[in-house]
């Protein structure tokens, strides 16, 4: 099962419809975090530290569905925490899929095969498996031996059963570029739809701040890792990959990925949680975005995350015929605007 063309048509129509309505800011992807608890303790993860006081809290199925409805985006990215730990994750996924929204569920794959027994394959559903390198590098990054093998088996099993599968990789300072390239080739050869990639964001709650990569250093890494001649299938759209290489610039549009958590909607964005609100419309105000973004808030200075800039490439492509044609030729609208946690 490959990338559905229906997503390309629906996403394009959705954007044009909102533009006609005169909406300057609106969501492309609902980032849904039904819990923040995880069964791993990755060094670069800010969520399990930031939400330490509510790790036992679950968002109910009905509240998840209401958040998706309030946002209205055609794409839902389920993150966390580890979503498969939610006792009703199958109901959350299946009921959103029943609405014909496209669901991407992030997972470390430890419980993925168990979840497959309750969530059937669908063109509207895709596993996004976290992979940070080949076996030694990945197991080191998640602080547990054997996770790479478990994830690899789960990916193979899911593909064999007809599920859509992608991977998601976070690039940190000091990464082994050759190891990343080998992993991307490995996943491409396994038959995943593509590999998502993004630099790690500098969460202040993470003790080891040397882990995070600067914007300048990240672009040097991506110029090498994203070399098109390697034949790797990347899931991010080609304009965003150009941005990662430093070949183009965009203004952050993180409002396009509103994030719902056990405490409500994160404000202002998926990465920064200065406060939480119960009204998603608060995230689209002019006043709010006068305060955030590169050059406005120092915390945004090194950010290259797809949740802020991949959507920006989509919005701009629709106003630049050359970029739009390139997106169509490379089949990129099927996966455009995806942000994975």
Question: Residues of each region from the PLM?
Answer:
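Radical SAM enzyme [4Fe-4S]-AdoMet core and its adjacent flexible, acidic
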Residues: 59-60, 125-132, 140-267, 271, ...
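Flexible mid-to-C-terminal extensions adjoining Fe-S/redox cofactors in radical SAM and related proteins
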Residues: 26, 265-341
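Short, charged, surface-exposed secondary-structure boundary motifs
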Residues: 115, 137-141
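Conserved alpha-helical substructure of the radical SAM core
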Residues: 2-118, 122-123, 330-333, 341
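Short, solvent-exposed turn/loop segments enriched in Gly/Ser/Thr/Pro and often Arg
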Residues: 81-82, 198, 309
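The −1 position to Zn-ligating cysteines in a subset of zinc-ribbon hairpins
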Residues: 37, 41, 251, 299-302
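Short, P/G- and charge-enriched loop/turn segments at secondary-structure junctions
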Residues: 17-21, 243-247, 289-290
